């Protein structure tokens, strides 16, 4: 995902920074707390890389930590369905690391631009049903820090279900016609 984002000039964190690093497995979605780790410095990062290798995980992604508001987003490509939430508002987090930047400040940002970037990424990855995380910086810029297929849609399941049906209906109708 990171290579696709870089090649297509989509906003993602730098490889280097001064506020620490995140390391996560690059071969699959995070399945346990140790699959995504914050490292305060390059020494901790080196230790974390070794830990991943010991667990049999060779493919890792390293991103510089970005200060700002964590926003979770959910979308269904081509349907207009796109929702953003601040998990820090209600402590709706999967792992405590989601609270690394503290309570959200609700920095202004363009949800339309985030949606356009997420839709572009969904097309490039052929992932029409998607979710992810972004960090909104104080200056209103954002970076996408995670992107995956078939998220939980935990905060908008009913709306998402309608959008998924809308997205799938043409393909289902076409398939049905071919079988008749």
Predicted regions and their residues:
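Anionic group-transfer/hydrolysis microenvironments
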Residues: 26, 65-66, 74, 133-135, ...
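A long amphipathic alpha-helix within ATP-dependent nucleotide-binding catalytic cores
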Residues: 93-144, 163-178
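Phosphate-binding site of ATP-dependent enzymes
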Residues: 39-125
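Conserved N-proximal alpha/beta basic substrate-recognition cap immediately N-terminal to
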Residues: 1-18, 28-29
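A short acidic/glycine-rich loop-to-helix N-cap element
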Residues: 156-162
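Generic beta-strand structural signal
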Residues: 16, 75-76, 136-137
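ATP-grasp fold ATP-binding core
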Residues: 16-34, 57-71
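A short beta-strand motif that forms the metal-chelation/ATP-contact edge
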Residues: 22-24, 73-75, 140-155
